[in-house]
């Protein structure tokens, strides 16, 4: 599994991947993929890093868990492959972008186009057993991704962190808010959005405004 971590990220992750917890995590994930159907495909476990090299990173969007249904998870938070029905949270993300930026609702839910512009679409837990949400939580992934967020905060400047929902907001403790922009709010899930905690946050225009002020190319959402 360690071999799947892209070269551009190895420099800031080499210390944590040598720790006992990561060795235990590797053994757990290897066993799970051998004995059960798991998502995403093993080759896509670190897709969030592979599609967004460290030197191109501008934005971090944090999710919690990969999709646990067949054909959905591809290693990027909130993203689904082309021609796959958009999950409810992704629909609400696109609706907010529509309103915030006056752009058309996209046909595809594949967010690799965002990743290639410098957005890391990171789930706190990078794997899951099929049809069992949260089944790979508390096995070491959270330690790995918390460390990753902390290292990114130290290494980089003027990034935008989009933290949606209570779980994601707790990750702000790993981010230096004096050198990065943290945009936090309700989760885009229908439960949260229908209570008024999602729509109207204007996170996407605020993100672009911050990037522009800091001399970075805006995201084509």
Regions found by a protein language model. Give the residues of each.
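Generic N-terminal amphipathic, Lys/Arg-enriched alpha-helix
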Residues: 1-13
């Amino acid at each position: 599994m360690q071999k799947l971590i892209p070269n551009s990220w190895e420099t800031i992750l080499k210390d944590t991947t040598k720790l006992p917890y990561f060795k235990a995590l590797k053994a757990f994930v290897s066993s799970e993929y051998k004995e059960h159907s798991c998502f995403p495909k093993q080759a896509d476990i670190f897709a969030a890093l592979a599609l967004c090299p460290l030197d191109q990173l501008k934005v971090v969007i944090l999710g919690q868990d990969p999709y646990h249904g067949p054909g959905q998870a591809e290693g990027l938070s909130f993203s689904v492959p082309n021609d796959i029905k958009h999950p409810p949270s992704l629909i609400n993300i696109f609706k907010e972008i529509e309103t915030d930026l006056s752009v058309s609702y996209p046909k595809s839910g594949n967010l690799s186009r965002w990743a290639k512009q410098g957005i890391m679409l990171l789930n706190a837990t990078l794997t899951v057993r099929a049809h069992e949400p949260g089944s790979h939580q508390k096995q070491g992934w959270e330690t790995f991704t918390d460390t990753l967020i902390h290292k990114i905060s130290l290494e980089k400047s003027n990034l935008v962190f989009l933290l949606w929902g209570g779980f994601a907001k707790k990750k702000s403790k790993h981010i230096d808010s004096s050198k990065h922009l943290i945009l936090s709010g309700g989760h885009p899930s229908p439960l949260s959005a229908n209570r008024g905690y999602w729509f109207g946050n204007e996170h996407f225009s605020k993100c672009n405004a911050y990037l522009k002020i800091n001399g970075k190319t805006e995201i084509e959402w």
